[in-house]
Swiss-Prot record:
It comes from the Bacteria. InterPro entries: Spore_coat_CotF-like. It comes from Bacillus subtilis (strain 168). This is Uncharacterized protein YraE. PANTHER family: SPORE COAT PROTEIN F-LIKE PROTEIN YHCQ.
């Protein structure tokens, strides 16, 4: 699929933001003592990791064309 330049840039921006969120969640999770909050943060880590994989796939396909 062919993407316009602004679409690729938006995905790159979202990737940068989600990477920052992932780093923060992983770091803060180590400091949290509440088990429920840790579980929520782990869910966030899992979801964000999947999203970043999807973004990587989109960007990879965009650069091949």
């Amino acid at each position: 699929m062919e993407y316009a330049l602004h679409e690729v840039l938006e995905v790159q921006e979202m990737t940068a933001f989600k990477t920052l969120c992932l780093t923060k969640s992983k770091t803060m999770k180590a400091l949290v003592s509440d088990p429920k909050l840790k579980e929520i943060m782990q869910q966030d880590v899992d979801i964000t990791t999947r999203q970043l994989q999807e973004f990587a796939s989109i960007l990879s396909n965009a650069k091949q064309e």
